[in-house]
Amino acid sequence: MLGKPFFGDRLEYINISCLLSAPSKSMNKAELIQIIIHQLEEKLRIAHASTQRAIDAATDEETVPEHKYDTLALEASYLAHGQAMRVQESEDELRQYRSMVIRDFTDAPIGVGAYVVLVDENNIGKRFFIGPCSGGLTVAWQDQEVFVLTAKSPLGRALLGKEEGEEFEMKIGDKTTCYEVVTVF
């Protein structure tokens, strides 16, 4: 399984399944997407509340300018506009996840919608979901931490087209890390 140039023979004796719980047949990608949607709904709820607070602050009688240099109301209106944009972005993210078509990537190259487990040369495993948006989001699924990546992120771009068992290098700054794609579905 490992034993290729990046990892060498030192890992032949390690049972990777002990390091990472491989996805069982009971792991349901629809369940993972639903957890992501739930977290995005919470993000939207918070964005709505923040927008309302910013609107209230912008229209409060105490923010009426007392002189030409008093910019509190103007600043509050900018904040309200920014918060409203956050609401729109959150609604768009939810639309994208709700309309996702669930695909199986077991025998296919990695693409948007794939669940991927990577192991680096230090035997550190991480789980990723390649989503249409919301990169940076982290969710708990099947007692595991899953990081949401987009195809636009450096790691997301590197993963696109890879298949289970492939190895690749990622250079970030002056550090190069080697990974193996252990699981894809």
Name each model feature, range by range.
Residues 104-169:
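Non-DNA-binding regulatory cores of transcription-related proteins
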Residues 9, 13-15:
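Intrinsic-disorder-associated, low-complexity terminal segments enriched in Asp/Asn/His/Tyr and depleted
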Residues 14, 23-106:
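N-terminal intrinsically disordered, low-complexity, charge/repeat-rich segments that act as generic
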Residues 133, 181-185:
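Short, compositionally biased
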Residues 124, 172-177:
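Short coil-to-beta-strand transition motifs
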